[in-house]
Amino acid sequence: GKIGKVKQTIGTGPHRQGNYERPDWFYDRQSYGGIITDIGSHQIHQFLVFTNSNEAKINHALVENTTKQDKPGFQDFGEVNLTGNGGHGYIRLDWFTPDALNTWGDGRLLILGDKGYIEIRKYTDLVKSEKGNHLYLANNDEVKYMDCSNVKLPYFRNLINDVINRTETACSQELTYLSMKLAIKTQELAENK
């Protein structure tokens, strides 16, 4: 492809806590599953897809609660480092999105290849644009920006179809199970379980 063989993904999953009261389950570890299984499962899935990995080793996993000491089950920061049979992955998750940001989180995905890289700014581009769906590409031939806001996203339509018709057009069940298996194992490792 345009960036060669994918070597690594870096995925961020920032979210906003907000200045409003949340239900009790939001702070109960047994109810929400932990920051890695709750938020990080998406980034783990992306890592597996873009590195074309069908197995992975967990090198590092960490979760912390630094802002809500009165809610000991809450986790506001997490990080994960993975090595798959197709590449490497780093994931950062947090509940630190500042109130001034126009969206709930500045989610990004960086895909590094051996001939270039792609950066996707999913929900905002900070001071440049309040809308999302920005893609930046840099390789040996070009440096390019693409506004992807009008690109059709068939994944969720296909996922609904998969559930109804027991098909695997959005993604395979095997990939879904592997993503969640890794998310749960990583969460447990981070919590020293």
What are these regions (language model features)?
Residues 39-42, 151, 171-174, 178:
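A generic structural signal for residues located within well-ordered alpha-helices
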Residues 146-157:
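Active-site loop of classical SDR/Rossmann-like NAD(P)-dependent oxidoreductases
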Residues 82-86, 136-141:
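Short acidic, glycine-rich loop/turn motifs
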Residues 6, 59, 121, 170-172, ...:
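Short, hydrophobic secondary-structure boundary micro-motifs
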Residues 158-193:
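C-terminal helix-rich "cap/oligomerization" subdomain common to oxidoreductases
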Residues 1-72:
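Predominantly a Rossmann-like dinucleotide-binding segment in NAD(P)-dependent oxidoreductases
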Residues 109, 125-140:
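Short polybasic amphipathic segments
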Residues 45-125, 156-166:
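Contiguous beta-strand/loop segments that form the cofactor/metal-binding neighborhood of enzyme cores
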